[in-house]
Amino acid sequence: MEQIVISGTGVFTPEESITNEELVRAYNEYAENYNLANKNKIDLGEKVALELSNEEFIFNASGIKNRYVMDKKGILDPNIMHPILDKRTNDQPSILAEMSLKASKDALDKAGKTPDDIDAVITACSNLERAYPAISIEVQELLGIKGFAFDMNVACSSATFAIQAAADMIRSGSANTILIVDPEICSGHLDFKDRDCHFIFGDVCTAMVLEKKDTANSSNCFEILSTKCITQFSNNIRNNFGFLNNAKKSSPLDRDLLFMQEGRKVFKEVVPMVSQLIIDHLYEEKIEIEEIKRLWLHQANKSMNDFIGKKVLGRVPEDHEQPNILQDYANTSSAGSIIAFSLYSQDMKSNEVGVLCSFGAGYSAGSIILRKVS
C-alpha cells in the first residue's frame, strides 16, 4: 500500500485575544443590565435572573484561560456581545479564505512545497462562510493551484476526516499532493450572552500538506499508518443555522441558530466512544499501547481529554504525552488537535508513534495513527 505522509503543518493565529477576566467582565455587565431592566418580571417570576460568571468557574469547567478571536471589540461590548466583521464585496477574498492563505503558506514552507506542487485542496471546518462557491475553490484560485477543490463539514472532526479522505485519494491516484485547510471562526456561532458556553470557543486556522512518502523532503514528516472514522447521530451538540431558515421564518435572534449543547450528556457519551475508538484502532493495527508516545486530542475540554488519555494509556498521561493547548486557544473545533500536533511533534524521534484524534458534533470521531519519519 502506498505510504502517505503529513509533510507540513501551518497555524494562523488572530492578533486579538480575550482573557477569562475580560470575558467575565463583559458578560457580568450584560447580565447585571439584563437583570435590572427585567427586575419587575423577575420579581413576579415571569423571567429568570441571569447568574453572574467568574474566572474560576470557567477554568474549572474547561481548562481554558484565553482565546484568540477575529474581533474582540464587539464581543466585549455588553450592548453587542458578538464579533463585528467588515462586510466584503464579492471581489475581495472571503475571511475564511484569507485565514486559509496564511496558514497554507506556513504549511507549504514547512513541507518544502509551492502551490505548483499541489493538485487538490480540501477545506474542512465546522462552519462555512457561505453556501457557494466553495471556500476551497477560492483558496485554490488565490494560491494559483491547479486540479480540484471541495469543502467538507464533520464539525469538530472535520480535519481528521479530511486526512482520511486525502490519504485515500492519494492512494487511489486521484491526486498526488493535497492541501487541507481548517479555518474556524467559532466566535461567530457562539452565544456570548449564555453563561454556560460563552467561554468555550476561539478562532484560528490550521493547514496540512499530505503527499506520498517518496516525494516528501520535510524535516518533520509523519507517515499515516492508519485512519479510522466513526459517526453516531446525536442532538446533544447542535446548530440549526442553515439555508432554509428564511423559509421557516426563523429570526436571526433565535437561540437555536447558534451553538447549543447538553454538556453533561456529551461528556458521558463521547468520552467512552472516543476512548474505545482509539483502543480498537490500535488493536486492529496490532500496535501496543506502550508504543504510543503522543496523543494529540481534540481540544474541547481538559477533563474530557484527561479521562480519554487515562483510559487509552491505562494511566494518567504525562504532560508531554498529551499536549494541551486549551488554556491558550480554547476550543477551536476542527483545528484544535492540529494545533497540538503542529506545536508538539518536532521533538519526537524517528519511528515513534502517536495518535491524532478529533471528535465532536454528530457525534463524530476520527483517529489517525502516525509514525515519525524524519
Predicted regions and their residues:
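Conserved beta-ketoacyl condensing-enzyme motif
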Residues: 6, 50, 54-154, 282-305
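Short beta-strand segments
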Residues: 7, 124, 153, 178-184, ...
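Claisen-condensing/thiolase-fold acyl-transfer catalytic domains that form or cleave C-C bonds
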Residues: 101, 108, 127-128, 141-142, ...
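Acyl-CoA/ACP chain-elongation machinery
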Residues: 182-183, 190, 232-239, 301-304
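Flexible, glycine-rich active-site loops centered on histidine and acidic residues
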Residues: 174-205
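Condensing-enzyme catalytic core mediating Claisen C-C bond formation in acyl metabolism
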Residues: 1-93, 194-268, 276, 371-374
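Short acidic, glycine/serine/threonine-rich loops at helix termini
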Residues: 17-18, 132-135, 163-164, 189-195, ...
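Buried hydrophobic positions in well-ordered alpha/beta secondary-structure cores of metabolic enzymes
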Residues: 6-8, 58, 107, 121, ...
